[in-house]
Amino acid sequence: KITETGSVWWNIMDSYNTRTQIRSNAAEALLAMQGKESRSWKNYKFKRYSAGHAYLKDGEQCMIPQRIAERAARMGYYLKSIISWCKTASMPEPQQSRVSRNVEYILHLTIQRTPYFDKKSYLSLSPELGGKQSFESEKLSDFWHLPTSAGGEGHGAQFPVQLPGRCIALTSRENDIVLDPFVGSGTAAAVAAVLKRRYIGFDICDKYLQTAEKKINKATNK
């Protein structure tokens, strides 16, 4: 259960209402984005169709972050910010009718109007852990210009260290508990440990849990 002064950070990328295959994991989706997926449309058991949708036209942007934010607000959460994370690099998109996506969104949700928020940590935290980058303004805004992850650990959707580091530093104190319900390669948990927070992480994939444990041990010199 989230504490009264706690925060929820939710990173999500928008999508388009297009016909697509439903892939089983992030690594499989990454191969497809890189053009290395050899299966054809008919070989997929699960598929998403874009025609006949109740409120989205074929090829239209879905506005997923905004819809989640609206629903969360109706459930009683406070939507504090929708932050734009402008990545230094992104996957190419073979689209000729629109611009390519280079922004992901981070929803900051709380259960009360005035959560714990340490704005000074933006300037005091090391840039390697999510503090102010050399090309960012002195003012902490809702536009974050942070690098993408170099990857290399078998997970197709890794965070850069700076992203969870900034979120954790802004909205928690030392010894607080950080929960990551999709721990993946363990980046958020490792950063939480470095910042002297306790952490809980779980994932549906045992392979990722093993990777996460190794990353946490390395970060804490165990």
Please report, for each region that a protein language model flagged, where it lies by residue.
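Core catalytic lobe of class I
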Residues: 1-211, 217-221
